[in-house]
A protein has these predicted regions:
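Beta-propeller blade termini and top-face loops
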Residues: 1-177
Length: 177
């Protein structure tokens, strides 16, 4: 077995996001860097991997997030953690996956575990990295650390409560905040 990769096989689904805007529209990410899209509930799938930069095509897709506001918009984060790549990779599509724009330009050089869009405000995004949570209020153009007493720990999941404006952060070893 490859000592760097271990014995975990590739082609494992790591993340699934169903569009809240359109029935049957699903985004799927895998541990071998592929992002898949179906518009008919799984009848036909399109591999979108070649629409991303070469450098992320072999990385783990850590999260796909279907927009709460537009069926053509989605967000994808990749992590290079298992490859010891300490860069942030977050992308947005506004054309149903035809093209992807990096929105990670001013995030710190840390693997990204999760990206979430606020369900009430399309311009507000959150990312959880290996060390922190960051927020953007301009659709990913600029990012700032969230702060608010959060521990310096890997944020593995984020949830925006649907009825209250609370962000829940699931961390590695530091509980839920």
């Amino acid at each position: 077995a490859d000592k760097k990769r271990g014995d975990v096989p590739h082609c494992t689904i790591t993340t699934i996001a169903e569009s809240p805007r359109r029935e049957g529209l699903l985004w799927v990410g895998t541990d071998d860097g592929k992002v898949w899209l179906t518009k008919d509930g799984g009848g036909r799938w399109t591999d979108l991997a070649d629409r991303f930069p070469e450098e992320v095509r072999r990385l783990w897709v850590s999260r796909v997030e279907a927009s709460h506001h537009d069926e053509q918009t989605a967000f994808v984060s990749f992590t290079g953690y298992r490859e010891d790549i300490r860069s942030a990779y977050v992308f947005r599509t506004d054309d149903g996956g035809e093209s992807w724009l990096s929105i990670a330009h001013d995030l710190p050089a840390e693997p990204v575990n999760v990206v979430r869009q606020h369900p009430r405000n399309a311009n507000v995004l959150f990312v959880g990295t290996e060390m922190d949570v960051h927020v953007s209020i301009d659709d990913g153009a600029h990012w700032a650390p969230l702060g608010d007493g959060l521990p310096r720990a890997a944020a593995h999941d984020l949830l925006i409560h649907p009825r209250h404006p609370h962000l829940l952060v699931g961390t590695h070893g530091r509980g839920i905040w």
